[in-house]
Amino acid sequence: MRIELDNNITELAPAMAALQAFSASHALDEAASQAAELALDELLSNIIRHGRLDAGQHDIVMELAVEEGSLRIRISDGGIPFNPFDCPPPDLDLPLEEREPGGQGIHLVKNFMDEYDYEYRDRRNVVTLRKKLASNAP
């Protein structure tokens, strides 16, 4: 499934609905679906909010597939080059009020997904996520 989005916060709800419909139509297990929803919400929010320094429009393409026993999510965008997985992990030992802002969501993405990858290709950021499916899933 391929979905094209604008970098507008109003696009989050349709993107999440598309993921939920995809999960239901492929009978994906609840754990994989929830992990994918969290990861997609975080990454799309970051792309929409921070993807352009000039606040201009850029397109976002989301692709969903089930392959080799895993859910694959690929998100590409024409924003500024940025690898979210290069961000340092948050210091979880510090009290909340002493932590640096940001980075919590990417930390969750890394922990909830089984694989994550970033590349800059053809002037686009490309993030690929994989979540292994329960053995009874397609």
What are these model-predicted stretches?
Residues M1-I3, N7-I9, K110-P138:
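Flexible, glycine-/charge-rich segments associated with ATP-binding catalytic modules
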Residues L19-D41, E98-E100:
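Conserved short strand/loop->alpha-helix "switch" segment adjacent to the catalytic nucleotide/phosphoryl-transfer site
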Residues I47-R52:
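Short helix-loop "hinge" at the ATP-lid/N-box region of the Bergerat-fold HATPase_c
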Residues H58-A65:
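A conserved short beta-strand within the histidine kinase catalytic ATPase domain
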Residues A65-I73:
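Short beta-strand-loop-beta element adjacent to the nucleotide/active-site pocket used for signaling
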Residues I73-P101:
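Glycine-rich/acidic phosphate-handling loop/turn and adjacent ATP-lid/helix
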Residues E98-M113:
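Glycine-rich phosphate-binding loop
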